[in-house]
Amino acid sequence: MKNISEFSAQLDQTFDQGEAVSMEWLFRPLLKMLAEGDPVPVEDIAAETGKPVEEVKQVLQTLPSVELDEQGRVVGYGLTLFPTPHRFEVDGKQLYAWCALDTLMFPALIGRTVHIASPCHGTGKSVRLTVEPDRVVSVEPSTAVVSIVTPDEMASVRSAFCNDVHFFSSPSAAQDWLNQHPESSVLPVEDAFELGRHLGARYEESGPTNGSCCNI
């Protein structure tokens, strides 16, 4: 089975294409704003990233995975206000994540402790975690694992990657799913957390920029 560095290198290469490229400057600021629990206006994104409002609007229109409300405000991009199986509680606010790995990666990017609850994709048994920015505090059950896929392309982050990244209560609970997805793997939660830290590092220095296409 691949180690964390191999998974990280392959996913980094995949994330360097398609929709994921715009996440370099957009993702972390947007994630922090979504963590407040309210829809995010385009004007707020522009102010936070240093991009013109029209440029932010244009980029959002190119992202097939982004979730918008009727007013054009962002309500989901990795972290979402819409219910998913992956419950993500931060500062008493009930939010949701697109996939299991998101729940492990996002605490470091938003700088907050998060309480996570997600059903085992194989049995429905609840998997519960508390994750701080720099460590996994608790996992119940302790045998829980995370499925990982390495798609060849990432035109849509959610459909190509997130929709196949689940929690399982144990490796045995994941076996039927693995039999149906032979190119996939599972990692213990601690290893998946480290993989998330590797992948999240590309966004950690993102901040206001005055550039244009070269930063997209």
Swiss-Prot record:
Single biological process term from Gene Ontology: response to mercury ion
Look up the coiled coil feature and give its residue ranges. none
Catalyzed reactions = an alkylmercury + H(+) = an alkane + Hg(2+)
GO molecular function terms here?
Answer: alkylmercury lyase activity
Respond yes or no to whether keyword Ribonucleoprotein is given for this record: no
Matching HAMAP family:
MerB
Q: What is this protein called?
A: Alkylmercury lyase
Q: What species does this protein belong to?
A: Staphylococcus aureus
Which gene codes for it? merB
